[in-house]
From Swiss-Prot:
It comes from Arthrobacter sp. (strain FB24). F(1)F(0) ATP synthase produces ATP from ADP in the presence of a proton or sodium gradient. F-type ATPases consist of two structural domains, F(1) containing the extramembraneous catalytic core and F(0) containing the membrane proton channel, linked together by a central stalk and a peripheral stalk. During catalysis, ATP synthesis in the catalytic domain of F(1) is coupled via a rotary mechanism of the central stalk subunits to proton translocation. This protein is part of the stalk that links CF(0) to CF(1). It either transmits conformational changes from CF(0) to CF(1) or is implicated in proton conduction. The gene is atpH. This is ATP synthase subunit delta. It is a peripheral membrane protein. Keywords: ATP synthesis, Cell membrane, CF(1), Hydrogen ion transport, Ion transport, Membrane, Transport. Belongs to the ATPase delta chain family. InterPro entries: ATPase_OSCP/d_CS, ATPase_OSCP/dsu.
Amino acid sequence: MAGVSSESLTAALVALEAKLPFASLQLAKELFGILGTVDSSAGLRRALTDPSRSGDEKSALVKQLFGGKVSTDAAEIASGLAGSRWASARDIGDALETLAASVVIAVAENKSAVSASGITGLEALENDLFAFNHAVDSSHEVQRALSEPQASPAAKIALAEKLVPNASEEAKVLIGQAVSHPRGLKATNLVRRFAELAAKRQQRWIATVSVTRPLTESQTGRLQAGLNALYGRELKINMNVDPALIGGIRIQVGDEVVDASLLTRLGQLQRQLAG
């Protein structure tokens, strides 16, 4: 997805972010359901991506089709997409799929640690998705069964759940979507895409810290506390030592490089680390 479609998807993801702390699997299932309706009707896809129709007109069409049949949030998200600009009829479906998967991923992220080892819901989701793909890749028979056009979606979902019986509910939703509605892809390729979305969200909360020399335990603790305060949650720190680094320290959280102004907001972090 590129150009105007990419811009529309980015805007939709930004708008979705406000709903994610309270996201539910039901919302994701509703969005996947809307996607199924859109994918099943070439006429509807054309209507929703027709550049000659106004955004308000296309949004109203979605509200007319789905109002009262899905939650207010689902209808709002779908109508927002319809009111945006798309380069191709396929792109709006791809965007719906991405938003629905993002909701599932957020539900997993919102879970607290789920095991004695401290693994998070997001990590568990990624592990389950990888386990499913490994199970499929290890069996030609399973691959044939999942690609059999005569097999029902329900049968494929049942087979998938047998492959990863202990998977989280979030993983089951994404895997079920991939095997029942792969949208022209191999199911494992779509699951891999979902895993990449989860990994990207996980990366947002990893601080990669490059320093010219190893930090002491005390310095690392102050750095951790400062970053946690800045981002409003506990970050995982990956420490790299680079003697050639200019400036003594470089911090990157997800796609964001923590610049001098942010370091100042951390309470003169550089001076603290030097102490």
